Every structure is written in C-alpha cells, then in structure tokens.
Swiss-Prot record:
<dbReference type="InterPro" id="IPR024977">
    <property type="entry name" value="Apc4-like_WD40_dom"/>
</dbReference>
<feature type="region of interest" description="Disordered">
    <location>
        <begin position="462"/>
        <end position="525"/>
    </location>
</feature>
<feature type="compositionally biased region" description="Low complexity">
    <location>
        <begin position="472"/>
        <end position="500"/>
    </location>
</feature>
<dbReference type="InterPro" id="IPR036322">
    <property type="entry name" value="WD40_repeat_dom_sf"/>
</dbReference>
<keyword id="KW-0805">Transcription regulation</keyword>
<feature type="repeat" description="WD 1">
    <location>
        <begin position="25"/>
        <end position="66"/>
    </location>
</feature>
<dbReference type="InterPro" id="IPR001680">
    <property type="entry name" value="WD40_rpt"/>
</dbReference>
<feature type="compositionally biased region" description="Basic and acidic residues">
    <location>
        <begin position="462"/>
        <end position="471"/>
    </location>
</feature>
<dbReference type="InterPro" id="IPR019775">
    <property type="entry name" value="WD40_repeat_CS"/>
</dbReference>
<dbReference type="Pfam" id="PF00400">
    <property type="entry name" value="WD40"/>
</dbReference>
<feature type="region of interest" description="Disordered">
    <location>
        <begin position="371"/>
        <end position="398"/>
    </location>
</feature>
<dbReference type="GO" id="GO:0005634">
    <property type="term" value="C:nucleus"/>
</dbReference>
<dbReference type="Pfam" id="PF12894">
    <property type="entry name" value="ANAPC4_WD40"/>
</dbReference>
<dbReference type="InterPro" id="IPR015943">
    <property type="entry name" value="WD40/YVTN_repeat-like_dom_sf"/>
</dbReference>
<dbReference type="GO" id="GO:0048188">
    <property type="term" value="C:Set1C/COMPASS complex"/>
</dbReference>
<feature type="repeat" description="WD 2">
    <location>
        <begin position="69"/>
        <end position="108"/>
    </location>
</feature>
<keyword id="KW-0853">WD repeat</keyword>
Amino acid sequence: MNLCLIDPFKQSDVPETVEYYLVDPKNIKSNCASFNRRGTLLAVGCASPIGKILVWDFDTKKIVRTLYHHTGCVNSISWSRNGKKLLTASNDGSLVLWDLATSKILYSLELESPILFAEFHPRNNDLCLIVLQKGTDPILLNFKSSEKTPLNIKSLVTSYIKREENSTGVIPTSVNSNYNGVATFASFNRRGEKIFFGDSCGMISVLDFKSMTIDRQFKVASSNTTVKQIEFSRNHRFMLVSSSDKVLRLISLESTNLYQQMREYQDSVNRMHWKKCCFSSNNEYVVGGMNHKSIHSIFIWSVSGSLVKDLEGPKEGLVDVVWHPLRPIIVSISFTGVIYVWTAYFEENWSSFAPDFQELEENLDYVEDEDEFDAKDSDNENQEVNNNNNNNIGRNPYKKIKTQQELNDKNSEEEEFVDVDHNDRITEFSSDEEEDLFCFSAIDDRYVSNVKFDDPRHPLYEKYQKDKEDSSSTTSNSTISSSSSPSPSSSSTTTTTTTSQKKDETQKKEKSTKKERNSDSKKRK
C-alpha cells in the first residue's frame, strides 16, 4: 500500500476487517499469541497433543522458528525486553526459557501443577512471575540462582499488619485484616515496581517489589467474584480488570496508592463472559473478546466509555486476542486454531496524487442516444443546435451540446487549404531526425577550372555524358519527325533558302553586266 494516497483526515486507528489469516502448515490448533516489543515477530503457542511454538515473521507472514519441548497445550508466551528470549508455559507444568537465535533451551522447570500464566520482569530478564492453577500460590523465579519464592497473599498481608501495628500502634486500613482470599492471577506493572494480584474475592492486592510487602488492597467486584485477568496500558495510566461477573473495569493508576474505578464495560445484549482483554497501542481503546463457542466477537470501546466497534468474525469461538504494539492491528485466535489478522480499512485518495483527477461517489452507466455518433453534415448540425437551444427538456444531462462557434470552427478546419506541392524548409533538426538529412559532398574548384567535362576525372563527367546522350537522342527524334511530317517551321526554312538563292543570282547578273559594259567601252576606244 502507497501511504501517499491515504487521506490523512479519514485514517482510522481501529481495525475493521480481516485482511488475512495464518494457519499452521500441519493443521495444529493455535491457543495463545504474543507480539515482541516492536511487533515484527508473533509467537504462537499450539494446543495438544503437540505443544510446539511457532514464531511468525509478521511482515513476510512466514514461520522463522519452530520450537518443540512441551507435551501439553501452551497457555502463555512472554517476550524478553530485548526480544532475544522467549518464555513459554504449558498445561503439563513445564516452563521453558528459549534462545531464539539458536533455538536452544536456556532453562527449563517442571512443576506439579499446570501453569496458566508466566511473564518476564519488565526490566530484569533473570526474573519471571508464574501463576499456577487455582489453589496454588504464584511463584517468583530467578533463572540464575533457580530460587523459587512462593507469594502467599494471606501471609504477606498478615506480616504487613503486624509490622505496621508494632511501629505505629494502629492497624492499617489499607489492607483487610480478615483476608482469606486465594490468588487467581498476578502480573507486573509496566515498570516492574509492583505486582498486582487478583483473587477469588473480587479484590486486588498490590505488592511492592522492593520491600516484598503488601501495601494496598482494594475491592473491584463482589465477594463471590473471581479476577481472571489484569492488563496495563503502555502509558502507565490505566489498569483493566476482567472478572467472572461479565464486566471489564477500567481503573486509574495516576494517583499514588489511590486506585479509582473509572469505567465498566459489558455486553448488555448477550451478557456473555469475556475470554481475553487488552489495551490498544495508543492507549485510547479497550478491547474485549467474547467467550462463546459459536460467536467470534470482539468489542472495542474508547477509554471514555463509548462503544466504537463490534467486530464479527467467523462462526466459531474466540480463544485469544492481542493488539499490535505499534499499529492498529488485532490478532485473534479461533477455536479451530486459525489466526485472524484484523486491520483498519484505508481509503486511498487519488486526487491528492493527481490534482486534475475527479472522484466519483458512485458509478453511473451512460446510455447514448441512437443517433449520437452518426455522421452528420453541417446543415444538420446547425439544425440540431437550434433545436437543442429551443428545447432542452428530456435531453441527456451527460451529452454536450455543440454551440454555433464550435460548428464554425469545425467548418473552418475542414476548409483549410493544405499545400502538398511545396515543403517548407526545416531550419533545425533534433537528434531523432538526423536520418532524414541528405548531405552532398563539395566539388573541388581545381577540377572545374583545369579539367574538362569530357574528362573522366571530372566529378560531373557521368552527368555530362548522360546529358549529351539525352540531347543527341532528342535531336535525332526531331529530325525524324520533321522529315516525316512537315511543319510550319520547316516551310519557313525553305522559304528563307529560296530568297537567298535569288539574291545570289541577281548579284551574279549584275557582275556579268558590269563586265560586258567595261568590255564595250574598251572596244569603242
């Protein structure tokens, strides 16, 4: 796609349609997905019986890595901050740390309970947080020392209350002294400064990572509600909580130690549970994937609370949904394991590329008149102009009527005289017309002055001989024609010859007369 042709005023930052989909070559179902920090790679965990991991190049849509180790369904995938390591967790209780450059296993751990969620520490790739099946405490794992630290919320709350009571003499009100909840979910915030725990009592517990103490607890739902997922926005301002009461809650993190609920999002029509939730890359939208076996529905709300888009996919359930880190793209996984890529619809504006290009809102079929393209003479055209000017009712609005001036110009063009006998001299030529030029070689003056035309060395010798032959043939032809049929010119020549003969005879007679006279005079004497 050419970005120069996209109208900047109509660009949408919300996905609207499925552009393409990704399928495992061996038709193994996908179960979870995660982008790296830049969104160039997409890691996909597959379901049973082969819990392999596929790493897709999101630009070329090709598989660049295939990792095998798990025997159960892969439930969670987490990228390191530098994008060189991958952390995967499975239903079989295995946790694996991968080196993507070599496809080798850097660390592996086998637990007795299925692992539901695992993620890297946002600032330290040597630490990770593990969430196990309900009833088991979350674990903080150090890869270097292999130290596993269980995080029991009840014991942490009790120790915090005792410490505060001993130091101040007052029981702190920021925590519940009668807390009996069980952790169901845990996650680092964006900076890794705190760990947020969700439990089975609809409460969120905040653990300070440095002091490893619970310093805050707040309720988000009723006591019999389970917190299923916690997500954080990229700008560190909001937290999104998904619970079992079919409601997504937006909580503000701007105030220190004051977590205020801002919005609630739910499907008021179907009243379905939410399978997954996330934030958009620009922190302006909240996404919720519906948990239904035959409906692939994704709701997009603005942070202000209004519903922006309801994306309807194929008639199959949704397993996971993630938003691209930088672009308006959503990746969703269906029950059949197909990965759908949702993108925004960009409307290309060709008028910005070609200013003289006119855009049409709709296509119009033009129907011409029966005699529109018939050949007509000037009289008929003049009559047509008069008729059209007098009555324009019922005419085709797309047909252009010729004016009298246009008809006169057309007639003048037809009557224009074109001289084909004489060609104007071309004063200049381009390089493409050099083949049309004719060049003559100059004649040396010495040949003209010293050499005669009948000399073969003369450059015009051949032309001279040819002209001579032509003249001789012309003379012979004229002689033959004069002898065969006399003409007025021949008669005049004969008359001139006769007159000259008479004159000569007269002169001879005069001479003879003079001689006789002289002889007579001599005799007399």
